[in-house]
Amino acid sequence: MSYCKQEGKDCIIFVTKEDHEAPSNAELVEDDPNDPYEDHGLILPNGDINWNCPCLGGMASGPCGQQFKDAFSCFHYSKEEIKGSDCVENFRGMQECMQKYPELYPQEDDNDSAPSGGANTAPTDSLPASSTDSTAAAATENPATS
């Protein structure tokens, strides 16, 4: 006998072997050619925000989705001379939420713009002279053998 167990927002469906082996009777729904969310960008023709836009990268869903929607909506509809200046509290709320989930919303470091060698790679011209001299000397004293 199949049954569903609700755990928070998730519904876990348990099926028997017989249910699993039986042919599916699910009906596939064709895409609606009049779907107002289909083939549009971030802003719908009526000026509303398209929360289904892949350009949002899933930010509108997830644990901080509502905070993101509140902040983004506030900014989008802001009439202030400095657009969004009335939305500071919304963005703070979103930031506080995101800090609770660092694995989902990693912080960007200032070192993200470091050269491709990585943040810990220092150019040789910034090393003390004795350091570069000893490195060069070591390279000439112990040539690599093939």
From Swiss-Prot:
<protein>
    <recommendedName>
        <fullName>Mitochondrial intermembrane space import and assembly protein 40</fullName>
    </recommendedName>
</protein>
<feature type="disulfide bond">
    <location>
        <begin position="64"/>
        <end position="97"/>
    </location>
</feature>
<feature type="short sequence motif" description="Cx9C motif 1">
    <location>
        <begin position="64"/>
        <end position="74"/>
    </location>
</feature>
<dbReference type="GO" id="GO:0160203">
    <property type="term" value="P:mitochondrial disulfide relay system"/>
</dbReference>
<dbReference type="GO" id="GO:0015035">
    <property type="term" value="F:protein-disulfide reductase activity"/>
</dbReference>
<dbReference type="GO" id="GO:0033108">
    <property type="term" value="P:mitochondrial respiratory chain complex assembly"/>
</dbReference>
<keyword id="KW-0813">Transport</keyword>
<feature type="short sequence motif" description="Cx9C motif 2">
    <location>
        <begin position="87"/>
        <end position="97"/>
    </location>
</feature>
<feature type="compositionally biased region" description="Low complexity">
    <location>
        <begin position="123"/>
        <end position="140"/>
    </location>
</feature>
<feature type="disulfide bond" description="Redox-active">
    <location>
        <begin position="53"/>
        <end position="55"/>
    </location>
</feature>
<dbReference type="GO" id="GO:0005758">
    <property type="term" value="C:mitochondrial intermembrane space"/>
</dbReference>
<comment type="function">
    <text>Central component of a redox-sensitive mitochondrial intermembrane space import machinery which is required for the biogenesis of respiratory chain complexes. Functions as chaperone and catalyzes the formation of disulfide bonds in substrate proteins, such as COX17 or MICU1. Required for the import and folding of small cysteine-containing proteins (small Tim) in the mitochondrial intermembrane space (IMS). Precursor proteins to be imported into the IMS are translocated in their reduced form into the mitochondria.</text>
</comment>
<comment type="subunit">
    <text>Monomer. Can form homooligomers.</text>
</comment>
<keyword id="KW-0560">Oxidoreductase</keyword>
<keyword id="KW-1015">Disulfide bond</keyword>
<keyword id="KW-0496">Mitochondrion</keyword>
<feature type="disulfide bond">
    <location>
        <begin position="74"/>
        <end position="87"/>
    </location>
</feature>
<dbReference type="InterPro" id="IPR039289">
    <property type="entry name" value="CHCHD4"/>
</dbReference>
<keyword id="KW-0676">Redox-active center</keyword>
<keyword id="KW-0653">Protein transport</keyword>
<feature type="region of interest" description="Disordered">
    <location>
        <begin position="101"/>
        <end position="146"/>
    </location>
</feature>
<dbReference type="GO" id="GO:0045041">
    <property type="term" value="P:protein import into mitochondrial intermembrane space"/>
</dbReference>
<feature type="domain" description="CHCH">
    <location>
        <begin position="61"/>
        <end position="105"/>
    </location>
</feature>
<keyword id="KW-0811">Translocation</keyword>
